[in-house]
């Protein structure tokens, strides 16, 4: 059994760690609330943009934008949104598993895969696995803007325009609540058929375009992709802070349990030490 002094040092070390994880839990909780506010503010725009684009896709257009047209899939692109830092439980690894499962399905069909990565964790993971990375951005901080993402988005859109990729997906963690973050692999291009799109087709909704459909769609569809990627980033940020808060709370609780266990061991060691001292005193007295 370890000595009482050694155990006391361990208890002090665990208490210091507990203070750190407790502080990180409070910081994560504060950041999560701010991230939720940004996420909630941008969600209506992203969802409305998706609906409008879905209605447009089902309209009777003379001009068919390339982003609305299906084509043979030979190469698939993924924009993967991860965190820059760890200490957030299995958030990143669960996301990467979902992405890899989807990539394997396309690889089984003979399609190649290109990646644009957001966040250091995605970069280190996929580069370690030998993936073909076309773009990478990191260090977005706690308040990312669309301008921070445009570079990576443009790389993938240019590849799509040039026929270098035939389908584009967004991979991110969707924030459901504090305890649940859902890995998502959403198709961006060509525009997927959704329930809203089916409803639009059923009711034959249409739009009048000014000045002309081509000019409007060329701009609107790019904004659509940018808005979906930005929404994915802020959803992932809220998910990160929620996962970190839960992970640090668990670490703090575990530290408390460990301190209690060590305290019992310390008490036993102290008791054994006192018993030995008394035994030695009694033995010495008996010898006299």
Curated annotation (Swiss-Prot):
Which processes are annotated in GO (biological process)?
Answer: proton motive force-driven plasma membrane ATP synthesis
The main location is membrane
Give the signal sequence positions.
none
Against InterPro entries, the record matches this protein to: ATP_synth_F1_ATPase_gsu (IPR035968), ATP_synth_F1_gsu (IPR000131), ATP_synth_F1_gsu_CS (IPR023632)
- Kindly list the GO CC terms recorded for this protein: plasma membrane; proton-transporting ATP synthase complex
Q: Which PROSITE patterns match?
A: ATPASE_GAMMA
Give the UniProt subcellular location, in the record's own words: Cell inner membrane
Keywords associated with the record: ATP synthesis, Cell inner membrane, Cell membrane, CF(1), Hydrogen ion transport, Ion transport, Membrane, Transport
What is the membrane topology listed in the Swiss-Prot or TrEMBL record? Peripheral membrane protein
One Pfam family named in its UniProt record = ATP-synt
Q: Which domain of life is it from?
A: Bacteria
Supply one GO molecular-function term.
Answer: proton-transporting ATP synthase activity, rotational mechanism
Q: Locate the transmembrane regions by residue number.
A: none
Q: Record's family?
A: Belongs to the ATPase gamma chain family.
Describe its function. Answer: Produces ATP from ADP in the presence of a proton gradient across the membrane. The gamma chain is believed to be important in regulating ATPase activity and the flow of protons through the CF(0) complex.
How this chain assembles, per its entry, is: F-type ATPases have 2 components, CF(1) - the catalytic core - and CF(0) - the membrane proton channel. CF(1) has five subunits: alpha(3), beta(3), gamma(1), delta(1), epsilon(1). CF(0) has three main subunits: a, b and c.
Which named protein is this?
A: ATP synthase gamma chain
Q: Which organism is it from?
A: Aeromonas salmonicida (strain A449)
Which gene underlies this protein?
A: atpG
């Amino acid at each position: 059994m370890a000595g009482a002094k050694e155990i006391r040092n361990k208890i002090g070390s665990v208490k210091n760690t507990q203070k750190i994880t407790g502080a990180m839990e409070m910081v994560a909780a504060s950041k999560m609330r701010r991230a939720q506010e940004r996420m909630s503010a941008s969600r209506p725009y992203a969802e409305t943009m998706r609906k409008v684009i879905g209605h447009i896709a089902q309209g009777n257009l003379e001009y068919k934008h390339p982003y609305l047209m299906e084509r043979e899939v030979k190469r698939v692109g993924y924009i993967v949104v991860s965190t820059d830092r760890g200490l957030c439980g299995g958030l990143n690894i669960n996301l990467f598993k979902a992405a890899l499962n989807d990539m394997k399905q396309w690889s089984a069909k003979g399609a190649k895969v290109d990646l644009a990565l957001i966040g250091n964790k995605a970069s280190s993971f996929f580069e370690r696995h030998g993936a073909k990375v076309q773009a990478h951005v990191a260090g977005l901080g706690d308040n990312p803007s669309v301008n921070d993402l445009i570079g990576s988005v443009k790389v993938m859109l240019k590849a799509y325009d040039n026929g270098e990729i035939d389908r584009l997906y967004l991979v991110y963690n969707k924030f459901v609540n504090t305890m649940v973050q859902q890995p998502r692999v959403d198709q961006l291009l060509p525009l997927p058929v959704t329930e809203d799109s089916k409803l639009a087709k059923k009711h034959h909704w249409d739009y009048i375009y000014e000045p002309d459909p081509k000019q409007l769609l060329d701009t609107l569809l790019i904004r659509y992709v940018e808005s979906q990627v930005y929404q994915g980033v802020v959803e992932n940020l809220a998910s990160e802070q929620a996962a970190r808060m839960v992970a640090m709370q668990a670490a703090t609780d575990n530290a408390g349990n460990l301190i209690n266990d060590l305290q019992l061991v310390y008490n036993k060691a102290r008791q054994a030490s006192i018993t030995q001292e008394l035994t030695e005193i009694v033995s010495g007295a008996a010898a006299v």
